[in-house]
Regions:
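Short beta-strand immediately N-terminal to the Walker A/P-loop
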Residues: 38-39, 88
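Conserved ABC transporter NBD signature motif
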Residues: 64-72, 84, 117-118, 124
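ABC ATPase C-loop
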Residues: 153-154
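Conserved ABC ATPase signature
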Residues: 136-140, 144
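Helix-to-loop junction immediately C-terminal to a conserved catalytic motif
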Residues: 56
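The feature captures the beta-strand-to-loop junction immediately N-terminal to the Walker
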Residues: 41-43
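ABC-type ATPase nucleotide-binding domains, specifically the catalytic core motifs of the NBD
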Residues: 20, 60, 76, 101-119, ...
Length: 156
């Protein structure tokens, strides 16, 4: 395999997917390079979330390829993709309301060694993650819950 720097960070080729018999994604192809700022725009129901969920292994693709840094992850389950250090912050809140902020953050990690140091770095952007680490996540405001989700993605 060639060095990772020779590959786009994300490469999608001919991706097809949807829900049941309803096709949503039709031959989607794109490359996103490391450091590039990229946005997916469109009206409601156009497939933005379906695309992200399919790329992340949360929905099965009907056909096509997805690669992260040259590694073909087509057909991989989401937990295996996250082990590559790839994260996704969903538009719907996916926190565990009854767990603490810290417990929600730890869920993203397969290896919790160095958690305190990593949390310190993320808390530079989102201090609430440290100051309220024992608080039940369900008691956070909507904006604070979004910070928790972004922090969890950054920790992976």
């Amino acid at each position: 395999m060639a060095a990772a720097s020779e590959h786009p960070a994300v490469a999608i080729a001919g991706l097809e997917g949807g829900y049941g018999e309803s096709p949503v994604l039709h031959d989607v192809s794109l490359d996103v390079h490391a450091g590039e700022i990229f946005a997916i725009l469109g009206k409601n129901g156009m497939g933005k979330t379906t695309l992200l969920k399919t790329v992340m292994g949360l929905l099965p693709a009907r056909s096509g390829r997805v690669e992260f840094l040259g590694e073909d992850v087509s057909g991989w389950p989401a937990y295996r993709i996250t082990r590559l250090g790839v994260s996704y912050v969903p538009q719907e809140k996916s926190i565990f309301q009854d767990l603490s902020v810290e417990e929600n953050l730890r869920l993203a990690l397969r290896d919790v060694s160095g958690f305190a140091e990593r949390l310190e770095r993320v808390a530079e952007w989102f201090p609430i993650l440290k100051s309220r680490h024992r608080q039940r996540a369900g008691t956070l405001s909507g904006g604070e819950q979004k910070m928790l989700l972004i922090g969890r993605a950054l920790l992976t």
